[in-house]
């Protein structure tokens, strides 16, 4: 391994910005692939060669033919362990793997010579989502197994939690008053109320949907309680009837005596 990779200038080199990051491909088959930055929903390398931040950590992914990728590649295609997933966008010279020869600009098409594992076919299929750049110096992405990559994807691509709207007392009072008048207000009524309480019409619509669901649950629970009360009254009356009969019989005997 060249000693220049561990020089002070190489270690302290500034990390390139996300906007300037693309996937580099050097002419040498042994050149490393650099993944220093984060860009959108895909992981890209830095523009340049092996002199970037994390050039020494990642082996260069090579297609089965042994040749490299085109000189300028963008999109969501990423290679691990000689497999490439996602889309391939060729922007520069018509250069490609040995099995394809010269590759013209493909746009969102895929190179048929590059194998894709089962379950990841189709355009836009990406196995791994962006990896935080803080983790890159400590992991060799090229040596991760498929299961590890899927776990990494699940950890990083969790759905963001939506923020819950907090209504004021005045807003809740106005919404509740309108709900008592009508359970299904039209768009004009919702817009008028939204302007009155300084809310968006979408928020008012969502509140009414949730309020109707709560109202249906309360109505269902109250009906179930009334049914249970009726059943309890019937069972209690049936149990008390023999006792009443005994009392009536005793009273009849007393009257005869």
Swiss-Prot record:
Residues 160-219 bind DNA. Its main location: nucleus. CDD domains: homeodomain. Keywords: Developmental protein, DNA-binding, Dwarfism, Homeobox, Nucleus. SMART domains: HOX. The keyword DNA-binding applies. It comes from the Eukaryota. Regulates chordin (CHRD). May play a role in spatial programing within discrete embryonic fields or lineage compartments during organogenesis. In concert with NKX3-2, plays a role in defining the structural components of the middle ear; required for the development of the entire tympanic ring. Probably involved in the regulatory networks that define neural crest cell fate specification and determine mesoderm cell lineages in mammals. It is linked to Short stature, auditory canal atresia, mandibular hypoplasia, skeletal abnormalities: An autosomal recessive developmental disorder with features of a first and second branchial arch syndrome, and with unique rhizomelic skeletal anomalies. Craniofacial abnormalities can lead to conductive hearing loss, respiratory insufficiency, and feeding difficulties. Skeletal features include bilateral humeral hypoplasia, humeroscapular synostosis, pelvic abnormalities, and proximal defects of the femora. This is Homeobox protein goosecoid.
């Amino acid at each position: 391994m060249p000693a220049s990779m561990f020089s002070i200038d190489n270690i302290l080199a500034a990390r390139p910005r996300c906007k300037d990051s693309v996937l580099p491909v050097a002419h040498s088959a042994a050149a490393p692939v650099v993944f220093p930055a984060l860009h959108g929903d895909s992981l890209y390398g830095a523009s340049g060669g092996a002199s970037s931040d994390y050039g020494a950590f990642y082996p260069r992914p090579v297609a089965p033919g042994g040749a490299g990728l085109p000189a300028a590649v963008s999109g969501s295609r990423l290679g691990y362990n000689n497999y490439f997933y996602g889309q391939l966008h060729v922007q520069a010279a018509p250069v490609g793997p040995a099995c394809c020869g010269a590759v013209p600009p493909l746009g969102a098409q895929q190179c048929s010579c590059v194998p894709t594992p089962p379950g990841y076919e189709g355009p836009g299929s990406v196995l791994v989502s962006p990896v935080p750049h803080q983790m890159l110096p400590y992991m060799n992405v090229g040596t991760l197994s498929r299961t590890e990559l899927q776990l990494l994807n699940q950890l990083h691509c969790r759905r963001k939690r939506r923020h819950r709207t907090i209504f004021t007392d005045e807003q809740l009072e106005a919404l509740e008053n309108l709900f008592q008048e009508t359970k299904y207000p039209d768009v004009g009524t919702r817009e008028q109320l939204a302007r009155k309480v300084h809310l968006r019409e979408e928020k008012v619509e969502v509140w009414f949907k949730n309020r109707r669901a709560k109202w249906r649950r309360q109505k269902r629970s109250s009906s179930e309680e009334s049914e249970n009360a009726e059943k309890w009254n019937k069972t209690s009356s049936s149990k008390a009837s023999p006792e009443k009969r005994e009392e009536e019989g005793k009273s009849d005997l007393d009257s005869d005596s």
